[in-house]
Amino acid sequence: MQLTLTLSGSSMQLLLLVSNLLLWENMASKPTVLVSTEDLYHRLVEQSHNTFIKAADVYREFDINFAKRSWMKDRILPLCHTASIHVPENREEVHEIKTEDLLRSIINISVSWKEPLKHFVSAVTDLPGASASMRKKAVDMKDKNLIILEGLQKIFNRTQTKVEENENFDYPAWSGLKDLQSSDEDTHLFAIYNLCRCFKSDIHKIDTYLKVLRCRVVFKNEC
């Protein structure tokens, strides 16, 4: 009886091993589903448009409930930290810029917001009087920016015949953390306001130029 039990146990282990091997071979034989460039553009345009709407909502709520009118006369609105990133400023420049150069520009914008948005979420979460909706949208803005960035990088890599190991990207540094963490309420709120204002502007750029690129790449400029 004891020998029979031992053999049964060994047989069971062998059966499980074979089953696992067959399962692994079956999974390995299935090709990874590759999202087409066209579908990536469609998804990214949808994501960027929805993110812009949320950014506009957050900006509007902050402007109504927290912004101070005295800022308009007492403070000078600083340039956004992404101001140095070149993007087309008119229809002629849009027509002339290469696809990979425009992709590079909006990738630079998206990357430059990774760090600021982390701190923005913390600031909005801790902001007395901020609505639950505002807090949730701030988190969504951060998360969607990362999703958009990932998709942009995939598309960019597909435009290259050979992707260089040290691709020439220029990510502007953000220097607003000190003001954002300031104990002075006015300075702190003004820093949040500028993040709201600048991200709304930048995600609008990303959304606009993604639509330009989709028109060019997917619809062959017939849109």
From Swiss-Prot:
Residues the record marks as carrying a glycan: N108, N157
UniProt-listed Pfam families: Hormone_1
Record's comment on post-translational modification: N-glycosylated.
InterPro entries recorded: 4_helix_cytokine-like_core, Somatotropin/Prolactin, Somatotropin_CS
PROSITE patterns hit by this protein: SOMATOTROPIN_1, SOMATOTROPIN_2
Molecular function GO terms recorded: hormone activity; prolactin receptor binding
Keywords: Disulfide bond, Glycoprotein, Hormone, Secreted, Signal
Chief localisation class: secreted
Disulfide bonds: C80-C198, C215-C223
Subcellular location: Secreted
Gene Ontology CC: extracellular space
Cross-referenced Gene3D superfamilies: 1.20.1250.10
Domain of life: Eukaryota
Signal sequence interval, chain numbering: 1-28
GO annotation, biological process: cell surface receptor signaling pathway; female pregnancy; mammary gland development; positive regulation of cell population proliferation; positive regulation of lactation; positive regulation of receptor signaling pathway via JAK-STAT; response to nutrient levels
Similarity remark: Belongs to the somatotropin/prolactin family.
Protein name as it appears in the record: Prolactin-3D4
Organism: Rattus norvegicus
Designated gene of the protein: Prl3d4
